[in-house]
Amino acid sequence: MKSFLAPLFSRVEIHQYFRPMKSRMESAYQERLKHRFASLEKKFHLGYNRRIELLDEIFGRENVNIHKYDATEFPGGDVVAHFLSALDLPVEQSALSQSYNEGLSLPAVQLLYVYRKFNPSLTPADRAIVKQLSHMPGDPFRFHSALYHELLANGPNAVFLFEQRVGFSITENLTADDAIGIRSEQDLAEIPQQSLRWLSDTLSRPGGTTVVPPADADLSAVAALVASLHEPG
């Protein structure tokens, strides 16, 4: 990237955002599921500190600006507004992002997980399915702190070295969401009745077909209903 930009500009500045690690891991797992089946056996190598070392080496530390990705610290909760402000550029309403991506709810991730068990590869219908699932209410998707520690592959000093370089903390209250956090793939496969009713209500047509929800143990039938979410109403 530097070799491409250097002839065009006298100076190149880098602005990069980093989430706290547990939040990043939860977001990354959802993204994996959106594209393919993802087990909870594959560890997460987040490599925050190494990434910054590479940026410092290539662009020069004085040209590398690191920001914490935290919507509560952005003007109006908008990352685009924060980025423009960091560049001392006027914030035009038309330039702001239209919505803040909060991710899928826990019930939506559970349904997506079951769908992926039987449809492990990306299909043309997947984007429409994920869009439908994005409207599903419920608790936010969170990892239990024990699962987070199990999946994190970073070295013991990774967070310290990162925070020392960037000047802000990415430390989280790792147990804050343990009451709703998943511990294993078994938790993902336990589809509650409320989620089955949501599937039934979403797929049933007024004056037409009424979809009867399957038994919660019949995961193949649940996956088939999730696959039907791409069909127009």
Q: What residues fall within each predicted segment?
A:
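Anion-recognition interface
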Residues: M1-G233
